[in-house]
Amino acid sequence: MTVPTPAAATTPTLHRAWAADLDPATLYALLALRTAIFVVEQECPYQELDGRDLEPRTRHHWLADGGTVVATLRLLADPGGVLRIGRVCTRADARGRGLGHRLMDSVLAEVGDRPCVLDAQEVQEPFYARHGFVPAGERFVEDGIPHVPMERRRS
């Protein structure tokens, strides 16, 4: 008999918080998940922390299942009033359950009609296209991974 892991046991709960309102344990869990995905899983031995997680206008969104963070993203305020979605990731054992789409729906409800951009890993371009994002610039390679800048067009 297989015992379900927390990531497969229940429907995760959606959370969001401004950087200043995050308790240290939650911030640690968000950063640990991102490091597990972007540094370890994707084999990118580059600095994951960029200083933007604690900016006053940074909003973190995450899904927790049984107290375990299973997916996260952050919303940044770039110069000129443009919002930027980034660091979107889901635990490997929680993928295929639509959690990334839940996070995107949550953050885009907050964004509303304001301009919004992101830099997608090329393999994730169709995922973001489902949320109204289109390519918006020259493709580039970051940390050895091809990326495409994307923007959301207002409806």
Can you annotate each of these PLM segments?
Residues 2-55, 60-68:
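Short amphipathic alpha-helix that is part of the acyltransferase structural core
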Residues 55, 79-81, 142-146:
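Short acidic/glycine-enriched loop/turn segments that link adjacent beta-strands
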Residues 62, 68-77, 82-89:
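Conserved beta-strand in the GNAT
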Residues 90, 96-109:
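Conserved acetyl-CoA-binding loop-helix of GNAT-fold acetyltransferases
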Residues 104, 109-122:
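Conserved GNAT acetyl-CoA-binding A-motif
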Residues 122-146:
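Conserved active-site alpha-helix within GNAT-family acetyltransferase domains
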Residues 150:
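C-terminal binding/interaction regions
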